[in-house]
A protein has these predicted regions:
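Conserved N-terminal beta1-alpha1 strand-loop-helix module at the mouth
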Residues: 1-78, 88-89, 95-97, 102-112, ...
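Charged helix-capping and loop-helix junction motifs
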Residues: 49-53, 129-137
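Non-cysteine beta-strand/loop elements that form the S-adenosyl-L-methionine
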Residues: 112-120
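A short acidic, helix-capping loop that chelates divalent metal ions and anchors anionic groups
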Residues: 120-126
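Intrinsically disordered, low-complexity polyampholyte segments enriched for Lys and acidic residues
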Residues: 210, 234, 244-245
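N-terminal amphipathic/hydrophobic targeting modules at extreme N-termini
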Residues: 215-221, 225-239
Length: 247
């Protein structure tokens, strides 16, 4: 696939959702979400596959991506694996891994990205922790060989900004959007906080991650331009001043 999740990444939970799951996800996509992780691992494969087909259709119109939790990609090409395994990871277009400490990060081999959790105390998994906090998150991101999504208890714009400041290339969100009275508005609010914090003036993103533009379809390179050039990586540098210019 050639890119890693960034921005606001939505994790599904049909039991927490305030409406039908596909409708909640569609609203979040309207609010700017472009990455969705399908959980619902308790469903029979046939039902989960049907749900994956529906969610892929929702994401297709905006160039979004569905990632499936677990080793079975459900006829897709992107999975998110638990810390427990399998190892080595399957050969697919995009593979993520849940991590919680430096030892688990050290086990990464060919994964494309990782989540680190819990960043903050979470209502979804009460008592799960202890929470890393922004500083703990920063320390682990520094040691990570791959881009990192912050996960766990992220519900406010300030928390999103703290994660970006710690070096996260995205924030994985469940309850804040699933339980929201207006999932689209919540997704927009959190996405705006991410974009503001992730501007080039405030931080440099991990070189293999993309920062999505909320509400826009993927950009197609035009003549004389490239995605690499527009992202800032590989951009021509200004000429070095001569000795005379420096005097």
């Amino acid at each position: 696939m050639g890119r890693c999740p960034a921005g606001v990444v939505l994790l599904t939970d049909r039991r927490a959702a305030r409406g039908p799951l596909v409708e909640v996800v569609a609203a979040a996509v309207d609010g700017g979400v472009r990455w969705v992780v399908l959980r619902e691992k308790d469903l029979p494969r046939a039902e989960r596959l049907a749900l994956a087909v529906e969610l892929r259709a929702v994401l297709a119109d905006v160039g979004g991506t569905l990632i499936v939790a677990g080793p079975d990609p459900l006829d897709g090409d992107a999975v998110h694996l638990p810390a427990a395994g399998p190892y080595p990871p399957p050969r697919l277009g995009l593979v993520g891994r849940s991590c919680h400490d430096a030892a688990e990060l050290a086990r990464l081999t060919t994964e494309d990205y990782a989540t680190l959790s819990p960043t903050f105390p979470t209502r979804t998994k009460p008592g799960y922790g202890p929470a890393l906090g922004p500083e703990g998150l920063r320390e682990l991101i520094t040691a990570s060989p791959v881009p990192v999504l912050a996960l766990g208890g992220i519900e406010t714009p300030d928390q999103v900004r703290a994660c970006v400041d710690a070096g996260a290339t995205g924030v994985a969100v469940l309850g804040a959007i699933m339980r929201a009275p207006d999932p689209a508005a919540t997704a927009t609010t959190l996405g705006s906080a991410f974009e503001e914090a992730a501007t080039p003036m405030s931080r440099t993103p991990h070189p293999t991650a993309e920062i999505p533009t909320r509400g826009l379809r993927p950009t197609v390179p035009t003549q004389g331009s490239s995605l690499t050039a527009r992202s800032g990586h590989g951009r021509p540098q200004p000429p070095t001043a001569t000795t005379e210019e420096r005097q």
